Amino acid sequence: MNYNSINLVKTHLMNYPCPLNINFLWNYGFLLGIIFFIQILTGVFLASRYSPEISYAYYSIQHILRELWSGWCFRYMHATGASLVFFLTYLHILRGLNYSYLYLPLSWISGLIIFALFIVTAFIGYVLPWGQMSYWGATVITNLLSGIPALVIWLCGGYTVSDPTIKRFFVLHFILPFVALCIVFIHIFFLHLHGSTNPLGYDTALKIPFYPNLLSLDVKGFNNILILFLIQSIFGVIPLSHPDNAIIVNTYVTPLQIVPEWYFLPFYAMLKTIPSKNAGLVIVVASLQLLFLLAEQRNLTTIIQFKMVFSAREYSVPIIWFMCSFYALLWIGCQLPQDIFILYGRLFIILFFSSGLFALVHYKRTHYDYSSQANI
C-alpha cells in the first residue's frame, strides 16, 4: 500500500510529463490550489469563533477582529483570499479560452463546476458578517430567486432573510469548499488523463518531467503572488470591501447603492440592466451555461459546417470580444443604475452572448511545427 502511494505520487507529482514550452500562464492552477488551501485553513479557524445568530453574528466578527490574538490577520487573509481566488480563476479561465477548452472538455467542465461552487460559496460567505451591505445584498438575491417556487422559503427558512437564513448559510459556507476540493481532484485527474496543453495548441513529443523543472516555475509564481497577498491582507492597499458592510444591519435604512463584491459585478450588471428579475436570472444562468457549451464545440461543428481561419497562434476574434465584453460588464456593475449605463450594459450583454455563440463555431486551425527547430 505504501509502495503504491509513493508510486502514485511519483507518477502524478514528479514524473508527470509536461510540454517543454509552457510558460507562466500555466501557473494559475497551482496558485489557485495554494490560495484555496489557505482559504480553507483560515475559514476553519474563523468558524471556530463565529456565532451564526442574528444577535451575535456582527459582534462575533468584531470580537475576532479586536480581541482575539491575530484574529484580524485571519479575517483579512480570508477576505483577501476570496478576491484572489476569483482573480486567479478569471485568469485561469482566460487562459483556457485561448488554449484548452477545445482539447480538454472534461477538465473544462469540471473546472466550471468548481467555479460555480466558488460563486455560491462566496455569496453566502458575504452574508455572514451581517453588515448593512451583507443584509441588503442577501435580500436582493433571495428576492431574485423568488421566481422559483418554494426555493426562497427552503433557503431562508421563511419569507425574508432572518436567523434561520444565516444559520443555513453558515453550514453551506463551511461544507461547500470541501465539496469543491473533491471536484478539484477530479479536475486534476482529467487533466493528467489527457495531458497539459501548450502555447502552440497541439500535442508535442517534447516533454519534460514536472519535478523539478516546472515546479520551480510554479514556486516562482507563488513567491510573487504571496507577496501581493500578504501586502493586501496586512496593509489593505486596495479597498476590496464596501464601507457600509462595517455598519451593523439596519432593516429600515437602505444603502445608497447595493453593490456586491467586485468579482460578482459582471453578473450583477446583467441583473441590474434587465428590467425583469426572472429574465435577469435567466441571463445570468445562460452566461454560465455558455461557458459549459464551449466544451461541446467539436460536437456542434459536425452540425454547423462553418469554418474560419484566424492565425497560427489561434487568438480567436470572438473569444477576444467575449472577454472584453465580460470586463466591460464588470465596470458597468459598479456604476449607478443610470440610463447611459443601463444602455451600455444591454449592449455588452448582447455582445457577450453573440461573441460566445460565435466562438462555438469551429474554425480551421493552422499550425506550424516548431519542434524540428529544437535541438533535443
From Swiss-Prot:
Residue numbers binding a ubiquinone: H192
Q: Give the GO terms filed under biological process for this record.
A: mitochondrial electron transport, ubiquinol to cytochrome c
What SUPFAM superfamilies does the entry give? a domain/subunit of cytochrome bc1 complex (Ubiquinol-cytochrome c reductase), Transmembrane di-heme cytochromes
Q: Which CDD domains match?
A: Cytochrome_b_N
Q: Which domain of life is it from?
A: Eukaryota
- Binding positions for heme b b562 per the UniProt entry: H78, H173
Q: What is this entry's stated membrane topology?
A: Multi-pass membrane protein
| Residue ranges of the TM segments | 28-48, 72-94, 107-127, 169-189, 214-234, 274-294, 317-337, 340-360
Chief location bin: mitochondrion
Cofactor(s) listed in the protein's UniProt record: heme b
Q: Name one GO cellular component term.
A: mitochondrial inner membrane
Q: Pfam families, from UniProt?
A: Cytochrom_B_C, Cytochrome_B
Subcellular location field: Mitochondrion inner membrane
* Molecular functions per Gene Ontology: metal ion binding; ubiquinol-cytochrome-c reductase activity
Q: Fill in the subunit field for this protein.
A: The main subunits of complex b-c1 are: cytochrome b, cytochrome c1 and the Rieske protein.
What's this protein's family per the entry? Belongs to the cytochrome b family.
Q: What else is known?
A: Heme 1 (or BL or b562) is low-potential and absorbs at about 562 nm, and heme 2 (or BH or b566) is high-potential and absorbs at about 566 nm.
Q: What is this protein called?
A: Cytochrome b
Q: What lineage does UniProt assign to this protein's organism?
A: Eukaryota, Sar, Alveolata, Apicomplexa, Aconoidasida
